[in-house]
């Protein structure tokens, strides 16, 4: 394992590579989640009828630019989120294992889940303003609008306008939902990945390499999507509003279910799956490679004493 700083950089680089491929599905997912917001099912117009239809109508009306709205914010967010999630996971896991078992190498499902959740929550809090702007940019459409519309020129224009109109607290609107959502996802992403990796090596005799990384990250992606989607829907709605629709996470959850039915929290699930599977596969597979590169660079340029402090 590279140093904490090295793992942070490796995780951020890997996530940026992944988000380049999967960002368009994230745009469709957000619009599906906001479609028919707080409207009875029979009254809600279906402007986007699924993943492929969503991609099609956005391309027809807005071009490729429409699918990649908010990509700048997405890069910054991914560096902060996955840098923290992948960079802090192992130090937190080892610290907890040392505290409880007096052995940093002990593998415990409970400790792994807790370390994953904690590292994800740290990343979600750090990157929340950029995810807020990203969500608002992606939901905006001059042709087929859904939810509250925010016409920002770019990510930094969005940050400036939010700060001017809503203050610092506005930049952190929905951060509670983001921490719950990412805590759920992170609590299972890395533990599932490493669990699948160990089992595949032990029972199927797979060797450490791209094939093992692909299989392990696929299993992790499925589990992450199932656990994370309901809080993800709530987070999208909390981020996109300006404080006029929901008082908090539970208010948003109850209003959504009461007005649209319980299945409303699974709106955009298949778009999320289309996004999270390749994103998880690419992030974790690329992270294996970027970590190896960081380790080689650290071994070449850093002394042992300096590595212990990073």
UniProtKB/Swiss-Prot annotation:
Solcar repeat positions: 2-95, 107-199, 208-293
EC number: 7.-.-.-
InterPro entries found in the cross-reference section: Mito_Carrier_Antiporter, Mitochondrial_sb/sol_carrier, Mt_carrier_dom_sf
Pfam families given in the database record: Mito_carr
Principal EC category: translocase
Membrane topology: Multi-pass membrane protein
GO cellular component: mitochondrial inner membrane
Effect of loss of the gene: Leads to fluffy and albino colonies, and reduced conidia formation, when all 6 genes ctpA to ctpF are deleted.
Keyword tags: Membrane, Mitochondrion, Mitochondrion inner membrane, Repeat, Translocase, Transmembrane, Transmembrane helix, Transport
Transmembrane annotation, as ranges: 8-28, 72-92, 114-133, 178-198, 211-228, 265-286
Localization terms from the record: Mitochondrion inner membrane
Domain of life: Eukaryota
PANTHER family: RE38146P
Family: Belongs to the mitochondrial carrier (TC 2.A.29) family.
Functional note: Mitochondrial transporter that does not mediate citrate export from mitochondria to cytoplasm. Its exact function has still to be determined.
Entry protein name: Mitochondrial citrate transporter E
UniProt organism field: Aspergillus niger (strain ATCC 1015 / CBS 113.46 / FGSC A1144 / LSHB Ac4 / NCTC 3858a / NRRL 328 / USDA 3528.7)
Gene designation per UniProt: ctpE
């Amino acid at each position: 394992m590279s140093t904490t700083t090295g793992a942070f950089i490796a995780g951020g680089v890997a996530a940026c590579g992944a988000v380049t491929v999967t960002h368009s599905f994230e745009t469709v997912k957000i619009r599906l989640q906001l479609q028919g917001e707080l409207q009875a099912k029979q009254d809600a117009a279906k402007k986007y009828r699924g993943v492929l239809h969503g991609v099609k109508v956005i391309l027809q009306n807005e071009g490729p630019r429409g699918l990649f709205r908010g990509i700048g914010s997405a890069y910054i967010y991914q560096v902060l989120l996955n840098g923290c999630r992948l960079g802090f996971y192992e130090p937190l896991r080892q610290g907890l294992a040392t505290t409880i078992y007096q052995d940093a190498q002990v593998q415990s499902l409970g400790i792994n889940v807790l370390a994953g959740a904690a590292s994800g929550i740290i990343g979600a809090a750090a990157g929340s303003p950029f995810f807020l702007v990203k969500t608002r940019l992606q939901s905006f459409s001059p042709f087929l609008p859904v939810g509250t519309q925010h016409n920002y020129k770019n990510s930094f224009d969005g940050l400036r306008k939010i700060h001017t109109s809503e203050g610092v607290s506005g930049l952190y609107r929905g951060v509670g939902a983001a921490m719950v959502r990412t805590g759920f996802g992170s609590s299972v992403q890395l533990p599932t990945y490493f669990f699948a990796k160990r089992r595949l090596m032990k029972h199927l005799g797979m060797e450490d390499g791209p094939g093992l990384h692909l299989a392990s990250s696929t299993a992790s992606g499925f589990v992450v999507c199932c656990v994370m989607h309901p809080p993800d829907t709530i987070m999208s709605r909390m981020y996109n509003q300006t404080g006029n629709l929901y008082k908090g996470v539970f208010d948003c959850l109850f209003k959504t279910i009461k007005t649209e039915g319980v299945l409303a929290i699974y709106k955009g699930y298949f778009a999320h799956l289309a996004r999270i599977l390749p994103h998880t596969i690419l992030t974790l597979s690329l992270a294996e490679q970027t970590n190896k590169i960081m380790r080689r660079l650290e071994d070449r340029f850093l002394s042992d004493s300096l590595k212990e402090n990073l």
